[in-house]
């Protein structure tokens, strides 16, 4: 008597390797962890790129790109020489010194055309930042 089609062994059953449920659980957890870790907490920023050009004497040009996750009414800006989420009004009105962009002990002054600001250190060294 021939074996019944339901209980007989299939020849192609070994073509696919068996994967345990533990493997799939691990894969799902790993993908969730990767997705979660790439998210920034609300109201925080991180520096993505930082380039420095010191080819000119007595002058260093630095460019940085930041990624921010700002809350409603905030926008990416600078506080204490670090990227931060600041009140959008500051950016709209170009009152850059309201962000407190300079380090503690430095003085902040707007550039004449409001395209940026300067931070003056007690020793007289001046750092100029322009917004692009």
From Swiss-Prot:
Belongs to the TAFA family. Glycans are attached at residue 113. One of its GO terms (cellular component) is extracellular space. Acts as a chemokine-like protein by regulating cell proliferation and migration through activation of G protein-coupled receptors (GPCRs), such as S1PR2 and FPR2. Stimulates chemotactic migration of macrophages mediated by the MAPK3/ERK1 and AKT1 pathway. Blocks TNFSF11/RANKL-induced osteoclast formation from macrophages by inhibiting up-regulation of osteoclast fusogenic and differentiation genes. Stimulation of macrophage migration and inhibition of osteoclast formation is mediated through the GPCR FPR2. It comes from the Eukaryota. This is Chemokine-like protein TAFA-5. Keywords: Cytokine, Glycoprotein, Secreted, Signal. It is found in: Secreted. Residues 1-43 form the signal peptide. GO terms for biological process: G protein-coupled receptor signaling pathway; negative regulation of vascular associated smooth muscle cell proliferation; negative regulation of vascular wound healing. It holds the Pfam family TAFA. GO terms for molecular function: cytokine activity; G protein-coupled receptor binding; receptor ligand activity.
